Amino acid sequence: EMVELYEKYNDRVEAMFFETLADKRNGRNKSVYGGDVLCSSCHSAEHEIWSNSRHGRAYNTLRKINKAFDPECLVCHVVGFNLPGGFISELDTPNLKNVQCEVCHGPGRNHALAPQPGFGSKATEACIKCHVKNHSPRFNYTEYWPMIKH
């Protein structure tokens, strides 16, 4: 009975995800996000670290558990989900999959067009938005940061 309820819930959440795609697609050309490839044009060493981290594969974890449409999951596994110009779907915005630079440092398209020193928010503030007790019970910034330090 619980399995059946869970499957119905999942089906409904997936249907809702696809119902909102048209509206989101209309705003994608005005994106403030550039994606990891744009960032890597200047930050190649940082990009290499990210590519080999769990952040660089975050979206695949959703695919494996059939949750690549669930807004409660996407908000922490992609760039800018439910924000103007952010991730829409794997088909529409593949360049915004995974926990990329802009999740932690903020939208970077304008920075890439006119680089200025001091860009980006502090990682510690970004970490605690997604690394919460119920999803990341063992999260400890001092232990986790060395895994992605750049």
Go through each PLM region and give its residues:
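Hydrophobic, small-residue-rich alpha-helical packing segments that form membrane-like cores
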Residues: 127-131
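Sequence context of c-type cytochrome heme-c attachment sites
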Residues: 2-122, 139-150
